[in-house]
From Swiss-Prot:
Domain of life the protein comes from: Viruses
Name of the protein in its database record: Protein U67
InterPro entries: Herpes_UL95 (IPR004280)
Family: Belongs to the herpesviridae UL95 family.
Source organism of the structure: Elephantid herpesvirus 1 (isolate Asian elephant/Berlin/Kiba/1998)
Amino acid sequence: MDWLCKLEEDWKDSVFRDAVKDSLDICGAISPNERFTFVETPHHSFLLVTNILPDEHGVIKDKKLTPGDLITPSVTSVPVGNAKDLNHDIYQSSESSNGKTVLQKGCLRPNNSNYLMFNAKHIPEHHTLFTNAYVSYSKEDIQTSLSFNKSAFISKILSRCNVPGILDHNNVIHVDMLLWLLFAGPLSCCSRTHCFGYTRPDIRRPFPVVLPPILYNDSVDIKMFVNMAEIYVYGWYGDDKIKSFETTFFKNEELQAMIGELRAKYVRKSVPLWHVNSRICLFCALYLQNRLCLENLKHDVNKIPLSPIIIQDCVFNDTNISCQPTVAVGHITPGTNVTKLFPVYQLDKLLSYISLQPDGTCVITSP
């Protein structure tokens, strides 16, 4: 779809800029998922050209709630003497309860499909902290996360970003700068003073920051990938404290301009950044997870403020008695009769499985 705006020769440049801005606003409102190319003519007219290729994006259907997702019984009848015996089963159906005294109870019960929605409706208070879902990392995710050289992975992402129609005008223009700041910038490594990377004689520097598994998947929806990368880069560099990035790949002013573009996009939006600003590596995150799980066994804490990290399909999960890197600590999931296992990892054994190659890539090897 082409947009054409013809201006008179004697109009001021400010009017021309306003026309361009208004046209971009109109295009963004009509086609928010399209990326436009600006073409200017010598006679104060311009074109905003969008992708001419057919849109092959699939249509996402709205998810319908099932009876197990949301249970809100308005009235449940129980005998007065048995009021203290109310348990999880009493919320299943009001037909199993008979009595004269009526107790009103409505609940949103967490399950596999609405667990995050359940957590979002509960505010942390003293001794009642919320528990999030598991965060699972595969062997490939961990190798990508701990690699100082992610050029092969970045090349795959950039090749997908170059496909017309993938990104829109709301995304940053220079995706290569965005990925460099995320994976190789001055704030892309662990911020803890005693990072586990210093304990390895062959590394002697902090490990890279551990990111969500979606940012280690080169086949994920590319628009979702770029949007999440923008939030992390904005959270790390948005305060404009770094003046020199000490790189020969990009100019400082170009990187600052890209960060300013992100700041203008997110500064007035309520974007949660508490999880972004942590900037810790996988091993430091596992260390904090170990301490939190073990210390909570000593206290009366019903819920834990943690998304437990689960490491899949690699030697990290070896359960052999002679070399057992993990044990499990159980906690009852709030509002259910389900016990949730929090793995406690033996970090010294995990570190021994990590091998850093001469090119800066990480490989997980068996002991």
